[in-house]
């Protein structure tokens, strides 16, 4: 009985190690979950939508592009993550209602799809590239809205 017990414990430990070796790199470097909070991206996303964020593309393949939905660390409080759409690229000048923003070489202009109720670059200015975590890739929840997110 004692050897069966330890054999069972060893199987659990092996399973845990395999999970760590496979899941942790994926979670840290390739993709991560994100739950939408608030209404700034309505009608595209609603509060409570569960997304998978692609962290690989912007780190190894290419830079963000106009129209892509990204998740990033809020510049005024990096412990918070926001989701917005890229509306301006590095080096561009953005003019909205007579107010102008000149973007630096590593700055992006982001806005929520719900323009009237979004805290975004219009409020706090350009988003530094270093704050971008990744792009929205897949919506998993709610099940009725399960979809790949076109860019």
Question: Which residues does each predicted region cover?
Answer:
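Protein maturation boundaries and topogenic segments
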Residues: 1-81, 101, 130-131, 135-151
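Gly/Ser/Thr-rich beta-alpha loop segments that engage phosphate groups in nucleotides
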Residues: 40, 93, 114, 127, ...
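Structural motif
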Residues: 49, 65-69, 92, 107, ...
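Short beta-strand-centered aromatic/proline hotspots
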Residues: 83-86
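Short, conserved beta-turn/loop elements at beta-strand boundaries and strand-helix junctions
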Residues: 90-96, 141
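Acidic loop->beta-strand submotif enriched in PP2C/PPM serine/threonine phosphatases
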Residues: 94-105
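Active-site loop architecture of trypsin-fold serine endopeptidases
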Residues: 118-123
